[in-house]
Amino acid sequence: MQEFKQHTGLAVPLDSANVDTDQIIPKQFLQRVSKLGFGQNLFHDWRFLDEAGTQPNPEFVLNFPRYKGASILLARENFGNGSSREHAPWALADYGLKAVIAPSFADIFYGNSLNNGLLVVRLKDDEVDALFKLVEANEGQNITVDLEAKEVRAADYCFKFEIDDFRRYCIMNGLDNIGLTLQHADAIDAYEAKQPVWL
């Protein structure tokens, strides 16, 4: 997992509420065991006009030339609802997205995203509205997500957000559950060495 302290990138506005995990990454693409390769099928049923994924939908926002290379996704309320699948944050990250900003997220998706190094930021409705208007009105508009300061900045806007201190520490230091455990490897080994040997 990569460290995340601050990121500035092009933002793409997905103006849909209640986007579920099957829309993020449809179930027919969940056969992989690696985290890589899911990005090509992100929002498959919206991004493509055909099942094979060879005909891009020119009316879907991620296909607009002005948003090519976007690394921050703006979304609406209840993003990531539906069935629990870690493949959803994997697909978003593999596509190149570093953060998702929305008024609210489904709880399981929120946890899965942070556990996998995808920063999900909750802002107030009016703050998200302001960012949507800014990005839609200004081609090439970047947004900065500053995890150290717990701020989202763009143009003259500066919005504060909250995140659990433990999750913030893990993401800033690039630690997933395994990495966090390995930080305590010496203490674990010392504890194990003190245990009686059973035959």
From Swiss-Prot:
One BP term from GO: L-leucine biosynthetic process
Pathway(s) it belongs to: Amino-acid biosynthesis; L-leucine biosynthesis; L-leucine from 3-methyl-2-oxobutanoate: step 2/4
One GO CC term on file: 3-isopropylmalate dehydratase complex
Known EC number: 4.2.1.33
Keyword Signal applies: no
Top EC class for this record: lyase
GO function terms (MF aspect): 3-isopropylmalate dehydratase activity
UniProt keyword list: Amino-acid biosynthesis, Branched-chain amino acid biosynthesis, Leucine biosynthesis, Lyase
Known catalytic reactions: (2R,3S)-3-isopropylmalate = (2S)-2-isopropylmalate
Known role: Catalyzes the isomerization between 2-isopropylmalate and 3-isopropylmalate, via the formation of 2-isopropylmaleate.
Family: Belongs to the LeuD family. LeuD type 1 subfamily.
Assembly, per entry: Heterodimer of LeuC and LeuD.
PANTHER family to which the protein is assigned, alphabetical: 3-ISOPROPYLMALATE DEHYDRATASE SMALL SUBUNIT, 3-ISOPROPYLMALATE DEHYDRATASE SMALL SUBUNIT 2-RELATED-RELATED
Protein name per its UniProtKB record: 3-isopropylmalate dehydratase small subunit
Organism name: Tolumonas auensis (strain DSM 9187 / NBRC 110442 / TA 4)
Lineage of producing organism: Bacteria, Pseudomonadati, Pseudomonadota, Gammaproteobacteria, Aeromonadales
